[in-house]
């Protein structure tokens, strides 16, 4: 086999990348624009509720860890 035939696939790796046009790539992923006038209140509520729950749990766990640290090291 000729050396040029072996190197031919590697030249494709060295070629500059070609990006698809913006309009063709958008049409693949966005069928329609989401409605911005009416937010999905269920998702908003679940997101905020989860965030509040996690912060409360984090603070509670931190306080328990601080008390355990003080107890083990005789600082209390």
From Swiss-Prot:
Keywords: Electron transport, Membrane, Mitochondrion, Mitochondrion inner membrane, Respiratory chain, Transit peptide, Transmembrane, Transmembrane helix, Transport. The keyword Lipid biosynthesis does not apply. Signal peptide: none annotated. Residues 1-27 form a transit peptide. It is a single-pass membrane protein. It comes from the Eukaryota. InterPro entries: NDUFC1. The keyword Transport applies. GO terms for cellular component: mitochondrial inner membrane; mitochondrion; respiratory chain complex I. Its main location: mitochondrion. It is found in: Mitochondrion inner membrane. The chain crosses the membrane at residues 41-59. Belongs to the complex I NDUFC1 subunit family. PANTHER family: NADH DEHYDROGENASE [UBIQUINONE] 1 SUBUNIT C1, MITOCHONDRIAL, NADH-UBIQUINONE OXIDOREDUCTASE KFYI SUBUNIT. Complex I is composed of 45 different subunits. Accessory subunit of the mitochondrial membrane respiratory chain NADH dehydrogenase (Complex I), that is believed not to be involved in catalysis. Complex I functions in the transfer of electrons from NADH to the respiratory chain. The immediate electron acceptor for the enzyme is believed to be ubiquinone. This is NADH dehydrogenase [ubiquinone] 1 subunit C1, mitochondrial.
């Amino acid at each position: 086999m000729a050396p040029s035939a072996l190197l031919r696939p590697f030249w494709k790796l060295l070629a500059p990348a070609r990006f698809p046009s913006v309009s063709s790539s958008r049409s693949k992923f966005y069928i329609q624009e989401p409605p911005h006038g009416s937010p999905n209140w269920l998702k908003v509520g679940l997101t905020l509720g989860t965030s509040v729950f996690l912060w409360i749990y984090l603070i509670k766990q931190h306080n328990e860890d601080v008390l355990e640290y003080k107890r083990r090291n005789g600082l209390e």
